[in-house]
């Protein structure tokens, strides 16, 4: 095995670990959400996340927390609160695999928001595949079905929140340290969550606290896995593997919750996956052309 192939496989391995962690988060959130309110889950998740990040703050020094954009961190925290509480609540009323397929639609929302907030010019083929992608989202959510539950739209609200976070990250992440972005967002989200969580408070059991700690620490762990992966392979090289998360979710949901995706979820995935792949690769080409022209 040559060095290039070894580096590629190692990078993909790190990326797959991030997918496993992400699926585990959804499973844990769904399990916790059956008893604890999504506001309380969000509070503990980000409270523990901020605790886990403290050793890194000490290691890198207090200068790593210096920021010239406090309002950006507050905005990220508010979006995280809204996104994660909506996502956790959605998991309590819909299968894990439905959540996974909806998460694949986030690049579609990001593309639209980029037009308004980043002044990006979008070529017409990307608009076409975006429309097709949203058709896939409609197929997944089945708003036309007799048993349609409108509360499943919380997933869509969460996806929009996460897309807005992507826009903010694109604009500001290169100007702030990663530790400060993670730490301040976790602190703000925990603070915002606490007052509303107290209205629905149920004291977690020891086992639930352990799961909440795992949930809080895994967010940073996912980022670590992704950074390791992207240090070895290009982000577009990992794109096709992103959709293995659906396979992981199907297996986990079946064995833990006895869930299996319905035909609409699978049909929606078949539509959404190629459209988002097209967007990812076309964005990469656009970035390459931009760098070549500079």
Curated annotation (Swiss-Prot):
It comes from the Bacteria. It holds the Pfam family EamA. GO terms for biological process: amino acid transport. It is found in: Cell inner membrane. Residues 21-141, 160-280 form the EamA domain. Keywords: Amino-acid transport, Cell inner membrane, Cell membrane, Membrane, Repeat, Transmembrane, Transmembrane helix, Transport. It is a multi-pass membrane protein. GO terms for cellular component: plasma membrane. InterPro entries: EamA_dom (IPR000620). SUPFAM superfamilies: Multidrug resistance efflux transporter EmrE. The chain crosses the membrane at residues 8-28, 41-61, 74-91, 98-118, 121-141, 148-168, 177-197, 207-227, 237-257, 260-280. PANTHER family: ACYL-MALONYL CONDENSING ENZYME-RELATED, SOLUTE CARRIER FAMILY 35 MEMBER G1. Transports S-adenosylmethionine. Belongs to the drug/metabolite transporter (DMT) superfamily. 10 TMS drug/metabolite exporter (DME) (TC 2.A.7.3) family. This is S-adenosylmethionine uptake transporter. It comes from Rickettsia conorii (strain ATCC VR-613 / Malish 7).
């Amino acid at each position: 095995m040559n060095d290039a192939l070894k580096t590629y496989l190692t990078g993909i391995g790190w990326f797959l670990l991030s997918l496993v962690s992400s699926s585990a988060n959804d499973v844990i959130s769904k399990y916790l959400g059956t008893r604890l309110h999504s506001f309380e889950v969000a509070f503990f998740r980000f409270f523990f996340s901020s605790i886990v990040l403290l050793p890194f703050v000490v290691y890198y020094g207090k200068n790593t927390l210096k920021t010239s954009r406090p309002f950006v961190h507050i905005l990220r925290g508010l979006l995280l609160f809204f996104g994660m509480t909506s996502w956790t609540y959605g998991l309590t009323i819909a299968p894990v695999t439905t959540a996974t397929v909806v998460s694949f639609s986030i690049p579609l929302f990001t593309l639209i928001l980029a037009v308004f907030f980043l002044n990006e010019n979008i070529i017409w083929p990307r608009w076409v595949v975006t429309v097709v992608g949203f058709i896939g989202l409609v197929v997944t959510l089945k708003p036309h079905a007799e048993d349609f539950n409108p509360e499943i739209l919380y997933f869509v609200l969460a996806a929009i929140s996460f897309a807005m976070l992507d826009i903010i990250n694109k604009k500001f992440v290169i100007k702030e340290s990663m530790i400060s972005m993670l730490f301040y967002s976790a602190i703000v989200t925990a603070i915002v969550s606490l007052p509303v969580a107290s209205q629905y408070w149920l004291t977690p059991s020891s086992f639930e606290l352990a799961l909440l700690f795992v949930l809080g620490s895994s967010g940073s762990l996912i980022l670590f896995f992704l950074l390791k992966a992207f240090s070895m392979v290009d982000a577009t090289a990992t794109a096709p593997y992103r959709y293995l998360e659906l396979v992981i979710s199907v297996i986990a949901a079946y064995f833990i919750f006895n869930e299996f995706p319905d035909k609409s979820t699978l049909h929606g995935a078949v539509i959404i996956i190629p459209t988002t792949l097209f967007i990812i690769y076309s964005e990469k080409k656009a970035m390459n052309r931009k760098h070549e022209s500079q």
